[in-house]
Structure formats: C-alpha cells, structure tokens
Amino acid sequence: MSFRGAPRGRGGGGFGGGRGGGRGGFQQRDMGPPATVLEMGKFIHACEGEMVIESTNPKVPHFNAPIYLENKTAVGKVDEVLGPINQVYFTIKPSEGIQATSFKYGDKFYIAGEKLLPLERFLPKPKPPPGTVSKVKKPSRGGAARGGRGGPGGGFSRGGGRGGGRGGFGGSRGGGGFGGGFGGGRGGAPRGGRGGFSRGGGRGGGRGRF
C-alpha cells in the first residue's frame, strides 16, 4: 500500500520530489523543442493519469522540465522525482491530448541537456582531511564572537518546509530538505515485492491501494 503523505520528521532515504512551493512569478514561455535531446528514461507504467519513468540518465531532471519523444515531440513535463539516489524514477504529467496509457513498457523519453542537474550536487560533501581546518580566533575583549554560518542545507525541493533530513531529496509538495534518496512516488516499483513509491511528503493522508 502506498501513501501520498510522508512524515515530516527526519526520515528520508529518498527524493521526495513534488509540487510544493509557490507558483507565482513569471511563467516560462514555450520556446519549442531544443536542438538536441538526450535519453532520459524508459516507460514503466501509467498511474493516476501520469507516466512513471525509470531514469536511464546519470543526471537528475529539473522539475517541470519538458519531456520529448526521440523525434522531439513534446509529451509532458517532469512532475515528481522518486526512488533511491542510485536508481532514480520520475513521473511525467502528460500534455493536453496525450494519454499516459498510450505508451508501453520500455518506450524511451528524452530531455534537453540544460534541464539536467549532476547527481553530485545532491550528495553530502566530503569532509576536509584533518589539519586543513583553520583555527578559530578567540574574540577580543569586550567583543562577542561572530556567529557561524550554520551547516549546509542541501536540498532539492520545490517548496520550502520542514521535510527532509540528510543525504537525499526530502519532502515533496511543500516539503523541503535533502533526505538520502528520492522518497516516495506513485504506483509500485518494478522490482521488490509490495514496496511502492509513496508520493512524497505533502498533502497528508493516503489514497489507499494502487
């Protein structure tokens, strides 16, 4: 059974990408297909009117990035990023007139190269070797020490919020943070028994069983 809501606590373990965040601001205009496209993933199954895709690209797609067929026909946009960081999945919200059920297992989807982010951007940064950290000077008399900048935030979330933890994409619709992998999603994963993608943090209660 897969639930749409994820707890707000640290947890994590996956990209919980989603639709959070404000939608204000300027809307990007459709500039047509790019000059070249790169293979992004293959169709697994349809779920709730969207396509669940297994990524075949070592990079991570932007949210709302346009997705194309090999002939550069636009079919939709990236809606959510799911799964563990070593096996990324994502969903495509189809464009008007496109049916998610019209595709079959293994069909390939493509993306513009500028709509990709390196996975390393979302991994914890290695600690510097011992002895390379400079010592902090003691404050002079009468002066208070300046506050530090705080720990690295990390995160790949479309909306700010409480979600997430360390080491991966945290919450989804409004949740933030980096949580150890892509958390949750739609439908069941192609491998591994009953487990499934949960839709990532956000709207609360589950929708029952897919």
Curated annotation (Swiss-Prot):
Spans annotated as Disordered: 1-32, 121-210
Pfam entry (one): Gar1
Protein localization: Nucleus, Nucleolus
Region listing for RGG-box 2, in residue ranges: 141-205
Keywords, comma-separated and alphabetical: Nucleus, Repeat, Ribonucleoprotein, Ribosome biogenesis, RNA-binding, rRNA processing
Complexes and interactors: Component of the small nucleolar ribonucleoprotein particles containing H/ACA-type snoRNAs (H/ACA snoRNPs).
Similarity-based family: Belongs to the GAR1 family.
Summary of the function given for this chain in its UniProt record: Non-catalytic component of the H/ACA small nucleolar ribonucleoprotein (H/ACA snoRNP), which catalyzes pseudouridylation of rRNA and is required for ribosome biogenesis. This involves the isomerization of uridine such that the ribose is subsequently attached to C5, instead of the normal N1. Pseudouridine ('psi') residues may serve to stabilize the conformation of rRNAs. The H/ACA snoRNP complex also mediates pseudouridylation of other types of RNAs. The H/ACA snoRNP complex mediates pseudouridylation at position 93 in U2 snRNA.
Protein name: H/ACA ribonucleoprotein complex subunit GAR1
Organism: Chaetomium globosum (strain ATCC 6205 / CBS 148.51 / DSM 1962 / NBRC 6347 / NRRL 1970) (Soil fungus)
